[in-house]
Amino acid sequence: MSLPMLQVALDNQTMDSAYETTRLIAEEVDIIEVGTILCVGEGVRAVRDLKALYPHKIVLADAKIADAGKILSRMCFEANADWVTVICCADINTAKGALDVAKEFNGDVQIELTGYWTWEQAQQWRDAGIGQVVYHRSRDAQAAGVAWGEADITAIKRLSDMGFKVTVTGGLALEDLPLFKGIPIHVFIAGRSIRDAASPVEAARQFKRSIAELWG
């Protein structure tokens, strides 16, 4: 089982704020996510600028595309994104359109599982050639005190068994990682737990050490 990668979510409102994080920890992570908040705040230039600074890193545009899949994904890929996200409630043709464009750029598409989705949809994504999903505990659910539970673990295992590469996100803390031991997680996303730490560098390194210990 390969080691899960570590992704930092830049849900900053400005590039200046995002740079404060990347200057510290870009070299400690595998994937740099231009979060939805930053995508809205700064547009695709955020993707272009971060990829220019860190060409050796995977840069994800968390656009959460809901419609106009080909147009919006092309905007992201032309800004040199490696991956883009499509929201789970989008029509299957939106996901297919985004994937068609991704292939032109040797990129990839992730389905963001935020909110309601079904296993029938999951099979449609697989049948369409989608290989990545993001299992997401929403920001608002976290604020309401919703913790990771057995239902989450069961769903993640089932997605993995279907052949998806699963990314896990949603207020992920270091102490949550053992919950997922034994599952071939593709990526763990940490946002505030790294960005807001007293030492973001050490927080990122602790995540990497824990991942190596649990999956090594």
UniProtKB/Swiss-Prot annotation:
One of its GO terms (biological process) is L-ascorbic acid catabolic process. One of its GO terms (molecular function) is 3-dehydro-L-gulonate-6-phosphate decarboxylase activity. InterPro entries: 3-keto-L-gulonate6Pdecase_UlaD, Aldolase_TIM, HPS/KGPDC, OMPdeCOase_dom, RibuloseP-bd_barrel. Changing R139V: 17% of wild-type activity. Substrate binds at D11, R192. It is an enzyme of class 4 (lyase). It catalyses: 3-dehydro-L-gulonate 6-phosphate + H(+) = L-xylulose 5-phosphate + CO2. Binds 1 Mg(2+) ion per subunit. Pfam families: OMPdecase. Mg(2+) binds at E33, D62. Its EC number is 4.1.1.85. The record marks K64, D67 as: Transition state stabilizer. Keywords: Carbohydrate metabolism, Decarboxylase, Lyase, Magnesium, Metal-binding. SMART domains: OMPdecase. Changing E112A: 0.5% of wild-type activity. Pathway: Cofactor degradation; L-ascorbate degradation; D-xylulose 5-phosphate from L-ascorbate: step 2/4. Its cofactor is Mg(2+). Catalyzes the decarboxylation of 3-keto-L-gulonate-6-P into L-xylulose-5-P. Is involved in the anaerobic L-ascorbate utilization. The reaction mechanism proceeds via the formation of a Mg(2+) ion-stabilized 1,2-cis-enediolate intermediate. Water molecules competitively shuttle protons from the side chains of His-136 and Arg-139 to alternate faces of this intermediate. The active site is located at the interface of the component polypeptides. HAMAP family: UlaD (MF_01267). PANTHER family: 3-KETO-L-GULONATE-6-PHOSPHATE DECARBOXYLASE SGBH-RELATED. Homodimer. Belongs to the HPS/KGPDC family. KGPDC subfamily. This is 3-keto-L-gulonate-6-phosphate decarboxylase UlaD. It comes from Escherichia coli (strain K12).
